[in-house]
Amino acid sequence: MSVADINKQEVVKQFARGTNDTGSPEVQVALLTARINELTPHFKAHMKDHHSRRGLLKMVSRRRRLLDYLKKNDADRYRSLIEKLGLRK
């Protein structure tokens, strides 16, 4: 198993709402946040990598849409997720 798979399983286990939960908004946002945080140092070193930056921006916008959905439907879950991930300052 690769390091990414192990990290992914840990994130899913930490944010899952049930035993087999992999698709809830909390899990999806947590996985996207982990991938975004993993890619951020790459862009500090390779500022002109615009092709990969587009993928990063797509991930950020997907996370934003999921957070908007969660905020609209269940504000308490939204606030707890933001607090756990440390997204808002």
Swiss-Prot record:
Keywords: Ribonucleoprotein, Ribosomal protein, RNA-binding, rRNA-binding. SMART domains: Ribosomal_S15. It holds the Pfam family Ribosomal_S15. GO terms for molecular function: rRNA binding; structural constituent of ribosome. GO terms for biological process: translation. InterPro entries: Ribosomal_uS15, Ribosomal_uS15_bac-type, uS15_NS1_RNA-bd_sf. The keyword Ribonucleoprotein applies. GO terms for cellular component: cytosolic small ribosomal subunit. The keyword Protein biosynthesis does not apply. Belongs to the universal ribosomal protein uS15 family. One of the primary rRNA binding proteins, it binds directly to 16S rRNA where it helps nucleate assembly of the platform of the 30S subunit by binding and bridging several RNA helices of the 16S rRNA. Forms an intersubunit bridge (bridge B4) with the 23S rRNA of the 50S subunit in the ribosome. Part of the 30S ribosomal subunit. Forms a bridge to the 50S subunit in the 70S ribosome, contacting the 23S rRNA. This is Small ribosomal subunit protein uS15. The gene is rpsO.
